[in-house]
């Protein structure tokens, strides 16, 4: 009994100490900040009634003209430097990257192997993994995978055509799920070499498990908040974050795929094959002569896992939001269709790698979609050493401090993007892009830790949208929700319910 009492006193004392130390952090340093909530910090409503983006919009708009390049923020229990000056963001992501190379995210390779993927890794582990994976995402590899994506997109067109009668007015379709089925089949083929066929059979474990990654948590809210606030401690305590059924499904899938390929000596020029080679070689010599260790089964599974979940969700959401905006802006849709059809006529009606790249207005439309609907609301970095902010010698981002770069808020800053709520692809004309700082548009991050799969994600979104817009017209209908409502339970920008649009054959 006394042991239990002493234990409770010790735990209470530790919590009180952590609360006092963390929640007085910015006050002691004289940095502007909002007073934190005892449980939620500056994120009251987290995973309850507020979308992550809203925290960052509101905080940025409150402090962006404060005169400080960064202000204090409490990401739940974790003090963080909230970057309101885009020039400082540029320094952190690019110029002074070596001091902010880590993200400081939870990962526990021993007990929760799927968390040790490229997005979460830090230090030498991240550097080595990035070097291993970079050859998979070259333009040459994209060209090789292009026919595979085209093949899936042709089946995609057939499925839509079957649901849309030739008669006037077409049919009302739920776009979000349809786009997700397309990208699931693409990623399943390119990552695993598996014919998922979710376009024809929407209910599948592959699709269900992919969805769960973005909506389900292994723990309740309090434990989840603890892991987010103290990722290193959570890892030392051997905590896990991946839902058990998701963990079991992907580990079994990867093990079975590897066993089959090694047994049959079957090779494909895909993501999985590169990783299997890294696993088999044990050590790999890079082009610069550096020798790095190979990859064990847990590391391999984690990289395939993140390629799948990041690739299908982000691209499908981008396509859905893009069609939603095109349905409301028929003039933009008509201009885009004219470009696509003109380019196709020059290529005898065939979508090729070169023709997709030639569709410059399509690229502008997608870029504007990613600005207005920023899927990942912020970037995180961690200071590896004390960092004196240039031009502000009394402002220091101390070693170990988390850094938040609110990308979604930059994207809706009226000083950077006049009339930010208006969908306007002209913002991304070549002239305007050249005149803009790269850190003012961050859907894929920037600098050495930008999104390694950017080329692939853009390729599949361009192909899918080109196939749709060249054959169908999308418009709003009575069931189209304007404006959209977003789910606070999703870790990316996801809607509550579907996106319904009228689809008609051209």
Curated annotation (Swiss-Prot):
Main location: endoplasmic reticulum
InterPro entries given in the database record: Cyt_P450, Cyt_P450_CS, Cyt_P450_E_grp-I, Cyt_P450_sf, Insect_CytP450_Detox
Cofactor(s) required for function per UniProt: heme
Identification of the protein by name: Cytochrome P450 6a2
Keyword Iron assigned: yes
Superkingdom of source: Eukaryota
Chain's gene name: Cyp6a2
Subcellular location: Endoplasmic reticulum membrane; Microsome membrane
GO molecular function: heme binding; iron ion binding; monooxygenase activity; oxidoreductase activity, acting on paired donors, with incorporation or reduction of molecular oxygen
Family: Belongs to the cytochrome P450 family.
Membrane topology type: Peripheral membrane protein
Residues noted as binding heme in the record, renumbered to the chain: 451
GO biological process: response to caffeine; response to DDT
EC number: 1.14.-.-
Matching PANTHER family: CYTOCHROME P450, CYTOCHROME P450 6A16, ISOFORM B-RELATED
The protein's role, per its UniProt record: Is involved in the breakdown of synthetic insecticides and may be involved in the metabolism of insect hormones.
Gene Ontology cellular component terms for the protein in this record: endoplasmic reticulum membrane
Keywords: Endoplasmic reticulum, Heme, Iron, Membrane, Metal-binding, Microsome, Monooxygenase, Oxidoreductase
